[in-house]
Amino acid sequence: MSIHKRIPALLLGVILLFAGIPAGSISAQAADTTQQLNNIVLFAQFPDADTDNFMADKTDTAIAICNDTSTPRSLTSYIDAISYGKLHVTSYFPQLSDGVIQPYVLQNSKAEYTNYEQYAIEMVQNIRIPDSIPLDGNQDGMTDNITLVI
C-alpha cells in the first residue's frame, strides 16, 4: 500500500477510535478546561515485506499527520477543532529511534493470520513502550488510545 493510502488510513483509524469515546467523559470536564488524551502509535510489518523498514522515509510524514499544529489536516488540529478546543490529542511514537520509526516485524506472514486481532495482540504484547511515554493523559486510570499501523 502506498504512503498516500496508508497515511489517510492511519488518520481515519485514529478518528474512528476517538469517535468511540463516550461523550460524557468529555462533558464531565469543567466548561473552561481542555481534556488531554494520549495516542500511542505502534508500527509493524510482515516478515515478507518488500523492505526492511517501510517507515524509513515516512517517519516525518507520520509524525506530522498526527501532531503538526500548523495545519488543520493533522489529527491534533482536527480533534481540537471538532471539540471546540475541549479535547487535545498528543501522539507518541515509542518505536522512534534516531529519528526513524523502527517497525516491529510480525512473527508470521500476512497469509498466516486469520484476522487482525491476532497481529494486534502480538503487537501490543511485544512492542515495548518506555515508561517515559504517558499512557493516561486524562488521568482516568486507563490507557487513552493505541493506534496500530501495519
Regions inferred by a protein language model and the residue ranges of each:
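Propeptide-to-catalytic entry region of secreted or membrane-anchored zinc metalloproteases
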Residues: Q29-I150
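C-terminal segment of classical bacterial N-terminal signal peptides
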Residues: L17-S27
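Bacterial N-terminal signal peptides that target proteins for export
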Residues: M1-L11
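N-terminal prosegments of processed precursors
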Residues: R6, V14, A28-T33
